[in-house]
Amino acid sequence: MKNYQFGADYYPEHWPEQRWPMDAKLMKELGLKVVRMAEFSWHKMEPEGGHYDFEWLDRAIDILRKEGIVSVLGTPSAAPPAWMIRKHPKIQPVGPDGITRGFGGRHHDCQSNPVYREYVKKIVTAMAEHFKDNPGVVGWQIDNEFGNSHYDLCMCDSCKASFQKWLAKRYVTVEELNKAWGTYFWSQEYNDFSEVYPPVKTPCGANPSQVLDWKRFHSDLICDFSKVQTDIIRSIVPKEHFITHNCMGFSDIVSYYDLSTQLDFVCHDLYPFGYWRDHSLEPFEIGVELDGIRGVCKAPFWIMEQQSSVTGWEIMGRKPASGQIPLWAVDSVAHGADTVVFFRWRSCLGGTEQYWHGILPHSGIPGKTYEEIGRLIKDMTPVMKEMEGAMPTAQVAIVRSYEQGWALDIQPNVKDLNYYGQLIKYYKAFYDKNIPVDFVKEDDDLSGYKVVIAPLQYLADSDLAAHYEEYVKQGGNLVLTMRAGVKERNNLCFSEGPLPGLFSGLLGITVEEYDPLGSACVPVKSVSGTEDNRDASGDTCSKTAGDELCASKWADIITLKSAKPVFDYDGESYEGTPAVTVNSLGEGKAWYVGCEPSESLMEAIVDMLAKETGTESVEGSDIKVPAGVEVTSREKNGKKWIFILNHTDEEKKIDISDRFRILSGALKDNKLQPYGYAVLEG
């Protein structure tokens, strides 16, 4: 990186060329250092097949460079032009209903189609060759938001053939596929790979093993589609040019873990107050997106699209309050962003996103948004220059697995049980206490964490069980939850013993029965008796989650082997049996939470874990903040930057030691204004 810090997504092709110098001048005055361009400009760069026109983009890059602004170029594969669709209609995607998704939006492409891939290779090669020596170009973005418009996943003939080849490579023989998928059920056996279709709409249900492999295949397909482009670019441009992609938080169409292996770093698109929401994201929801994306590469990242104003397609969302736009940008930095690029520079006059407002309004005349973002950039730029490469440090990790999410998306087990929802619930419990969290892969080195939370480890194998066991034996505290060890990796139910299957020895329990609660709730009480679920009158709580100690959605009926109970159910026919357990193993402990905890139960569990392991808040003894105020930090070479973020619309009193030096923000008389922030040197 070269300290870019702040930028904007710029579409010069949307405006008369005589306007470009004015835009560049206004960007410089604002403090912008980088723009992203061209990711939706295929027709402008190739108005007809084989005829390339990059001269307009040369001029735009040069105008910006003269004002000290460098450019990131996006490959345009997210929006093939109309002339291509007319010549090759089969490059359009086909949904599970067999209907072709047509031209007129974006991502109207099949990423497996060989004809389309050839066009992509040609345009990417032409761009790389043309811009490789341009001093104004510093990096490349591949495509745009993989998966954003591909939720149905293309099921055309090309994808069918590619899926069959993928299966043949994975299973070698059709007999192995039949075994892995359990095709004996409903007479689904195959005699040849050519008989296997994508999981199209059927009269009655679908094979969960087939659907899981389909999701795996499509993730691999997207990664391969991206790698075709990254390989071309790397073979042509200087090694100093970076390659990235703008991801979308917990979107799971493609594994960002796999995708990131071909990138220099990842980017994230953050819209806390999207038009599709009735209110802005809660602060913990912003935090979990940012920490989740940082966990993809275990490194600082960029925000390639940071909300700058009102968003909208057919309808528009609410206007962010004064101070929220800067606060959200600083929040991104606090969680690991080295550069923040605002979407977009100027509100577009036409097209689907004409109501997706930018730094400049439709008129192009700078207003309050421009001024507010300008104050932010002036305030934060000196800090961010010094902070580049610094990372948040965490003692707690949450395991995130794309395959676990896919499997539970196929079979949630009970209504509203969602894999990512569970990750976020555990994250929030630590976030509320200002305890930082990292997100990790299942096979990552866990030894640096005091606590590792692994929700819904639905698919399991012996390697995963051994990995977790080694972590615990070496002194770690592992938390597994309901539905752990239910299935093998092929999505067939585990049959070699009671649940939690391969985790039984580690956890010191068995689960031979369970109660799929759905919307019901079961009271829970502490085994020690120091905490219980009774109100002031001594009556047990009603069977709603509320603020009581309750189990919801699911109740594993646990039999203790070597484990000890921590919380017991206090109702239903299994009253008195454990809901939460702990098992000592080696130098560490393995905890099991056999339900979805209510908020109060979750808080009690996290308090217990923090006390047991000595896990500390960022606040420590030198900073005390009220509810609604977040404290987090980044560290580098022994230096620490502390961020205090007021996510409320009220002024907040902050108690801090005088040993801290205020670097930026508006902390005055130990008070933070509504939606205010402060960065301290600690």
Task: Annotate each language-model stretch with its function.
Residues 8, 27, 35, 64, ...:
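Conserved, mostly hydrophobic/aromatic
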Residues 6-17, 40-55, 102-121, 146-150, ...:
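The substrate-binding groove and active-site-proximal loops of carbohydrate-active enzymes
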Residues 15-29, 120-126, 248-259, 321-329:
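Short, acidic/polar
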Residues 11-13, 38-41, 74-83, 138-147, ...:
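Short, solvent-exposed turn/loop segments enriched in Gly/Ser/Thr/Pro and often Arg
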